[in-house]
Amino acid sequence: MSFFDIEAQSSKGNSQQEPQFSTNQKTKELSNLIETFAEQSRVLEKECTKIGSKRDSKELRYKIETELIPNCTSVRDKIESNILIHQNGKLSADFKNLKTKYQSLQQSYNQRKSLFPLKTPISPGTSKERKDIHPRTEAVRQDPESSYISIKVNEQSPLLHNEGQHQLQLQEEQEQQQQGLSQEELDFQTIIHQERSQQIGRIHTAVQEVNAIFHQLGSLVKEQGEQVTTIDENISHLHDNMQNANKQLTRADQHQRDRNKCGKVTLIIIIVVCMVVLLAVLS
């Protein structure tokens, strides 16, 4: 092989490795994008849970609508425009699940935003209204020569306005307290609802685990029952085999005894014949 052939093979191998390296690099970049999308979705989910709670505010909703949701949408569009997402089954399945979760987060945010609108705080009355509430009095001198000054009370502002102002302030304080209590009760009910949902989820998971354990126990009991049945059948077969063996041994013993009897009779006959022949010869 010449030097040029070796160079041609090495260049061919390098040309085959370059596309593979490029594909692996693109796949890694796509995986990083999916991880970024998952992380931003988790941040969005965490911030959406604050809607309707004490930490809810205009700044929070502005951040969700102008920063978190657009960032997630931008990363999602980048992933969808990547060709490799349709060629890699695992990454495609992960992205599909994240995309479905992101859509549900958007719907949840819109629902919570409409369910918990932000309330504007009650502002105190203007200075003009407060001036109207206070009784207006003016000092007049009835007699220029007299040193006494009489107070003239305006008919449109009786002295009872002080009590009315106090009642109005009490009413405003009560309304503010009621609104604060209603918001606290709403937050408390929301927290209780979330905790109950989590408890129900945990109970459901525990029930599923218990069902799985009972299913496994049922399978084990069934297997043990089959094994016990097999052992019982084997014991029955062994008992039958032992009985058959005892019968065969009894028959063999009886047959051996019969053969021994026949041998003894034959031996006696032979002895008698020999004695008769011997006596005949001697006589």
From Swiss-Prot:
Q: Per its record, how is this protein called by name?
A: Syntaxin VAM3
Gene name for this UniProt entry: VAM3
The record, for CDD domains, names:
SNARE_Qa
Q: Which residues lie on this side of the membrane: Cytoplasmic?
A: 1-261
**Which InterPro entries does the record match to this protein?**
SNARE, Syntaxin, Syntaxin/epimorphin_CS, Syntaxin_N, T_SNARE_dom
Q: How does it sit in the membrane?
A: Single-pass type IV membrane protein
Q: Which UniProt keywords apply?
A: Autophagy, Coiled coil, Membrane, Transmembrane, Transmembrane helix, Vacuole
Q: What else is known?
A: Present with 414 molecules/cell in log phase SD medium.
Which residues fall in a coiled-coil region? 28-48, 84-111, 169-189
**GO CC terms in record:** autophagosome membrane; endomembrane system; fungal-type vacuole membrane; SNARE complex; vacuolar membrane
SMART domains, per database record:
t_SNARE
Q: Tell me which residues make up the t-SNARE coiled-coil homology domain.
A: 190-252
Residues of the region (Disordered) are: 1-26, 116-146, 162-182
User: What Gene3D superfamilies does the annotation carry?
Assistant: 1.20.5.110, 1.20.58.70
